[in-house]
Amino acid sequence: DEELAHHLNADAKKYIADNNIQLYTINAIDKAIEIGMGKRTNTILQSAFFKLADVMPIDKAVEYMKAAAKKSYSKKGDAVVEMNYKAIDAGVDAVHKVEVPESWKNPEADAPKAERTGRPEVVKLVNELLDPIAKMDGDSLPVSAFADKADGQYVTGASAYEKRGTAVTVPQWDPEKCIQCNNCAFVCSHATIRPFLLTDDEVKAAPDNMKVADMKPKAGAYKYTMSVSPLDCMGCGECITVCPTAAISMQPQESQAAEQPVFDYLVANVSKKTDAGMVDTTPKGSQFNQPLLEFSGSCAGCAETSYARLITQLFGEQMYISNATGCSSIWGNPAATSPYTVNINSKKGPAWSNSLFEDNAEHGLGMEVGQRYLRDQAIELVKEIAASDKATAEFKAAADKFLETKDDTKANVEPTTALIAELEKAAAAGCEKSKEVLAKKDYLGKKSVWIFGGDGWAYDIGFGGLDHVLASGENVNVMVFDTEMYSNTGGQASKASNIGEVCQFAAAGKETSKKSLSEIAMSYGYVYVAPVSYTHLRAHETE
């Protein structure tokens, strides 16, 4: 009860006391672990509900629940059935009533919250919209709160402020055992475990409890650390699964609280080291790139976000994403809480949009054609300015470099920045065409257009549009999250499901074979297809 009082805020205490609410708690997590059910608390909580709700006699509820458990799990063996029986009994027995003290009617004021820092537009969004929504008080928001978002546009990066702390256990890194392969970061679905290289000055300025190691296999100018955000971690344990040297162990979240300031310091203050010999396009090297998809609402261990996060590490600052409805649109952009974000230095990141389910491929194609049209207009103006007598030697040099690299997404980044600087000088000197180009400057750099969606979209509902886009020969990238069933709607069979596959809502098993989307795409002869899985050779993904 004392711990509960510490965690409840003053408003909650007063509301409970003033309304004479009967308050109960149950330590379902410890009970589940004790029984052998791991983190599965649903059965325990269900029986606790029946104990308190009084919708039927509790002995009848227990009888029905145990009958359902036997029917559901008997094929998995008596031991599993018995564990569920114990969970049902535990839910009834472990409910604890909290005696609400009189002092809660006039509770002490909460300690003042630390002022949020970061991009002003994101902090404003979190304070004005995300906070009320997170408190289940979104209905109190006036229409005027959404006036500047009438077109549906939201700034990205708000997920970093949620800090939900939902994991029971989180990773702890052992620098002595670590071989610095970065496999743990490579598979992390929520970007909550990240490697960093630090200078001596960055190490000195860090929190005292930060652990570091010399770089391997050969010590260099930088120190290496692997940091975890315990308040963002979902506790899936994928990092442990892929670690070849047992350098990661799962520890109670409370024991790792001191790691949060370390992670926050590293994210905000440690720069990427471009001279450390790390190749961006290798599994190890890619993980030193800032992930521009972080702390999403996807399920613990979700592989979809692992792949999407990796793509943002390779192309994120130049990405346009057209996203089909499905799991990837739910974790990709829940209202006001975009997990996509911007590079901490350039302030650029993926631009994300969701159209109708069946129109996603066409929507993505429209993104490519539309931005290319605007870019071509700007490029023609740049050529005209460079050809004029008034163009400076510096402008001509910047324009030449930009035009040389205009078809290479990576190589075009720095020349675009240099050209914009020269355009600003020319505009200040009165060049009207430079002002026209600057009005379209966001389109100057070569973009990487991506179309995201699941197999329900790609194989079934949106296949006609996808086939049209693949056949068009346009320069777009398509990422299909092939879960071999309709995941977001609960588990129906799709054309991606294998013969005999049993899904939640296809219990009889699929009678036909899996559709070969890759062979259909390859039949055109000019579409590059790459099935990837990080459970196999990880280098294939970055390639």
Language model features with spans:
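Thiamine diphosphate
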Residues: E304-Y320, S329-V342, A427-Q492, Y528, ...
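Short acidic, glycine/serine/threonine-rich loops at helix termini
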Residues: L4-N9, I35-G38, N183, L198-D200, ...
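Iron-sulfur cluster-binding cysteine motifs and their immediate structural context
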Residues: A158-S159, Q172, N183-V203, S229, ...
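Phosphate/pyrophosphate-binding betaalpha-module
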Residues: V478-G525
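Conserved small/polar residues in nucleotide/adenosyl-binding loops
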Residues: T535-E543
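N-terminal leader/propeptide and maturation segments of large enzyme subunits in energy/redox metabolism
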Residues: Y73-S74, D359-A429
